[in-house]
From Swiss-Prot:
UniProt subunit comment: Identified in a spoke-associated complex containing CFAP61, CFAP91 and CFAP251; the complex is associated with the radial spokes in the axoneme. The complex associates with Calmodulin; the association is calcium sensitive.
Each WD repeat, start to end: 58-99, 103-148, 166-205, 218-257, 271-308, 379-418, 420-460, 463-502, 511-553, 573-612
PANTHER family cross-referenced by the UniProt entry: CILIA- AND FLAGELLA-ASSOCIATED PROTEIN 251, WD-40 REPEAT PROTEIN
Positions of disulphide bridges: none
Repeat as UniProt keyword: yes
SUPFAM superfamilies cross-referenced by the UniProt entry: WD40 repeat-like
Localization, UniProt: Cytoplasm, Cytoskeleton, Flagellum axoneme
UniProt keyword list: Cell projection, Cilium, Cytoplasm, Cytoskeleton, Flagellum, Repeat, WD repeat
Organism, scientific name: Chlamydomonas reinhardtii
Protein name stated in the entry: Cilia- and flagella-associated protein 251
Length: 815
């Protein structure tokens, strides 16, 4: 039922947010075998037995941290950003139990749950300007209570304890003590904080012990993560040098006058020969993960008891344990468990976007292959830069920045094959229309034409020293176009050569003075192949393929420049009835990729869109555009002006009965725009009138002399500026025009003569009469010279001439 009501529904997520520390939690409890991992804005619950995914959706920003309750019934996720959320999810249903909006001003960067499951600690994301952070403590009992079951009159859920972190080092890790939930440890790159709290207190007590390299006669690397040693008073901090800093309450504390509970660094101990990437605890063991992919277990005395060094999965980012011991250990005799390594089975996530399931008993295996674990999911490239859907099969290809290429089955969700291009930087790829070719472009300028089935090379060409950024194949499969970083379009053609055919380089053309955003082939109504490109310079160029040849090079047929001020174009596509799209497969799936290392497959259901369109059509175009406008007061005002314009057109003093046709002449459109607060320039007016004529063509009319209210709303919504002009824009304009401030002042100034001259000579110049009339209306002065002082500051011009409230602008800037 839900799918019928949603145009897009997430069907599968390939890959995971491999860079997030502790980004995987193990939900296996003896009855189910599930994990939950982060994939950009979504948390994915994956059932390893049934091979099914359940999606926890609701975050608008990438999720930064995840924890689970001890009984694995709930998971908690949090993110950072302007609409940050902290959400408690029911694992069985996939629905949120409790949602906290803005748990911190900028969201949550890291969090941890106490061993008894009663408390949740969060560390806020750093303020972008001040770097300020805070540590908070939440009651899990309150977070697990649905809003409808909360006591009546209870306000928004807030933390019980909150304390600002002293400035100087952004904290990125926090952990509870397994021995005492009233103690926590956090660390940044160079400082460690020990936190403690007492029931009823609104603030943490904290202490940050000093650490100097000369104390250990060696340098100490940046801190990665910190934990308490189970059953002891010690704490550990892992470093990028592969060392553990050991903190304890013993030593010289009494001699320096500090409290006996204030820990100090007493030892530096190397446990990896590479940077440590992860530190955690399970039972009485300390668990470490390294850049080398090794996972090691230590007892409370820091003696190594087990090591898993054959995983070969990449740098470790997460180690997550099942809630129970495996059956073979849970029911073993005491004699059998003596001196045996006993921990629950676990999963290891790595920076290579791999998730590996490991049986703890495999440590005792002699065969290295049995110690590698089993892959939970085929791993997607962690640095996807482009993807392409196969036009005829349920497959897609992804290209990684490091030169990796993979082919995936979008139904079985498995890896079909791939290839690694050594010493190449991936840039772009696309399929030919029949799916037989896969064309790949690289940052070196190389263009590889591959067999789409086995990814073997058919042709390799390099005709530019600049990196390729876009590539396209014609519908006939006879032309390939590529764009490079030097704003050039390169054209290749499949031409006869000695009784056979081969790909030939036709030439290149620099028709843009900005980055090329999109290259696309299409077909004219007569069936001729067309090639167009659009650039960030606002230019659309069409190339003459018929006139282009190896001898003549690439020929330009025509070009069109978008008016300035409308934003830079980012893509170009031919409208239907073209049957194939780069990101579509048989019109049933939409593939979406980003810089987060994931590819999402969405099911497309057009029924809700058709119902919405039918309902809007039945309600009239005005209702549709009114919904888009979303401002009832402005809509009412525009409707009043529209009615007044009809009356004014017939004559305000007319005595005969009014005939209100529901339309106004096109000539009144600019004035109606101004009445709504949009003051179009002459160029904007030209664009409005062009849009009106486009409306006429879409209605099979030669021209349109009148517009309806729905037409007016359409024009307003499509042409109004995204943001209003602000005082900051005026200041920037003064600087652009050469304004200089007084010594020690950053406020730009222009002379009155210079400003008046610029208004009458640059941009869309005003005549002397127009300028005098405008300044008189704005300031009441009879002459331009009396409307402003000899030297005009940007702030004076904004406040005294344009009427901006600069005090509010200054207050907003200050906040």
């Amino acid at each position: 039922m839900a799918e019928e009501q949603t145009a897009l529904s997430l069907s599968w997520v390939f890959g995971a947010s491999a860079h997030v520390k502790h980004g995987v939690v193990n939900l296996s409890d003896g009855y189910t075998d599930k994990i939950c991992y982060l994939a950009a804005n979504t948390a994915v619950i994956y059932d390893k037995r049934l091979r099914r995914q359940l999606f926890l959706q609701g975050h608008t920003s990438p999720i930064t941290c995840i924890v689970t309750t001890e009984d694995r019934s709930h998971v908690v996720t949090a993110d950072t950003g302007p609409e940050a959320l902290l959400v408690v999810w029911n694992v069985r249903t996939g629905l949120p139990t409790r949602t906290v909006q803005q748990p911190h001003r900028h969201g949550v960067s890291t969090m941890d749950m106490s061993a008894d499951g009663q408390w949740l600690a969060t560390v806020s994301a750093a303020d972008p300007e001040s770097g300020e952070q805070e540590v908070s403590l939440w009651s899990m009992a309150a977070l697990l209570t649905p809003p409808e079951a909360a006591p009546p009159g209870q306000g928004p859920l807030r933390p019980l304890v909150t304390t600002l972190v002293p400035a100087g080092d952004v904290q990125h890790s926090i952990r509870f003590s397994p021995n005492n939930p009233a103690e926590l440890i956090s660390n940044g790159r160079r400082r460690v904080y020990f936190w403690s709290w007492a029931p009823g207190s609104p603030r943490f007590q904290y202490y940050s012990p000093p650490l100097r390299s000369r104390d250990f006669k060696q340098s100490v690397g940046d801190f990665v993560s910190s934990v308490f040693v189970p059953g002891t008073t010690q704490a550990l901090t892992a470093t990028t040098d592969g060392d553990l800093v050991v903190w304890d309450e013993q030593g010289i504390a009494a001699q320096v006058g500090t409290s006996a509970t204030d820990r100090r660094a007493i030892k530096l101990m190397r446990i990896h020969n590479c940077p440590i990437t992860l530190l955690a605890t399970v039972g009485d063991f300390i668990v470490s993960g390294g850049e080398d992919g090794y996972v090691r277990f230590f007892d409370p005395l820091l003696r190594i008891v087990a090591w898993f060094e054959d995983l070969a999965a990449g740098p470790v980012t997460s180690v997550a344990f099942s809630a129970v011991l495996p059956d073979r250990l849970a029911h073993a005799d005491a004699a059998d468990t003596l001196n045996r390594f006993m921990v629950p089975d676990f999963v290891v996530a790595t920076r290579n976007s791999r998730i590996v399931s490991v049986q703890s008993a495999s440590f005792e295996e002699y065969d290295a292959d049995r110690r590698r674990g089993s892959s939970v999911l085929d791993s997607l490239l962690a640095d996807v830069v482009d993807l392409a859907a196969h036009p005829t099969r349920a497959e897609f290809a992804v290209l990684g920045r490091d030169g990796g290429l993979q082919r995936w089955d979008s139904i079985a969700h498995c890896l079909l094959g791939g290839r690694a291009f050594e010493r190449q930087v991936g840039a772009c790829l696309t399929y030919s229309r029949d799916g037989s070719l896969l064309v790949v472009g690289f940052g070196s300028g190389h263009l590889h034409i591959l067999n789409a089935d086995d990814c073997s090379d058919l042709y390799v060409m390099r005709n530019t020293a600049a990196g390729l950024v876009r590539v396209a194949v014609s519908n006939t499969g006879k032309h390939i176009a590529a764009a490079d970083e030097n704003h050039q379009l390169l054209l290749y053609a499949y031409l006869p050569y000695k009784h056979t055919m081969r790909w030939e380089y036709v030439g290149r053309c620099r028709s843009h003075h900005g980055p090329i955003a999109s290259v696309v082939f299409g077909e004219s109504p007569s069936g001729q192949t067309r090639l167009l490109s659009v650039g960030g310079d606002g230019r659309v160029v069409e190339y003459d393929l018929a006139a282009s040849s190896v001898a003549a090079g690439v020929q330009v047929a025509s070009f069109y420049d978008f008016p300035p001020g409308g934003g830079a174009p980012t893509s170009l596509s031919f409208a239907p009835p073209l049957a194939y799209f780069q990101a579509f497969a048989a019109d049933t799936h939409l593939l979406v990729s980003g810089a987060d290392g994931t590819v999402a497959s969405w099911d497309i259901n057009t029924a809700p869109l058709e119902r919405s369109a039918t309902a809007a059509e039945g309600a009239g175009g005005e209702a549709r555009w009114a919904a888009v406008l979303g401002d009832p007061d402005l809509l009412r005002e525009m409707r009043d002006y529209f009615v007044y314009a009809q009356i004014k057109t017939q004559g305000e003093d007319a005595l005969e009965p009014r005939d209100v046709p529901g339309t106004v002449p096109v000539d009144l459109v600019p004035d109606l725009m101004r009445s709504a607060g949009f003051y179009p320039s002459e160029s904007d007016i030209d664009n409005l009138l062009h849009h009106v004529q486009y409306m006429a063509h879409s209605r099979n009319m030669e021209s349109l002399e009148v517009v309806t209210l729905a037409d007016l709303l359409c024009l307003y919504i499509n042409h109004r500026p995204l943001f209003n002009v602000t005082h900051a824009d005026i200041v920037a304009a003064f600087r652009e025009l050469g304004g200089r401030g007084d010594p020690g002042s950053c406020v730009p100034k222009l002379s009155r003569e210079q400003l008046l001259s610029l208004l009458q000579s640059t941009g869309e110049p005003m005549s002397g009469e127009e300028l005098t009339a405008a300044l008189a209306a704005l300031t009441g002065a009879h002459t331009p010279e009396k409307s402003m002082p000899v030297s005009v500051a940007a702030e004076q011009f904004s406040a005294d001439v344009l009427g901006f409230d600069t005090t509010e602008a200054g207050a907003e800037a200050a906040t």
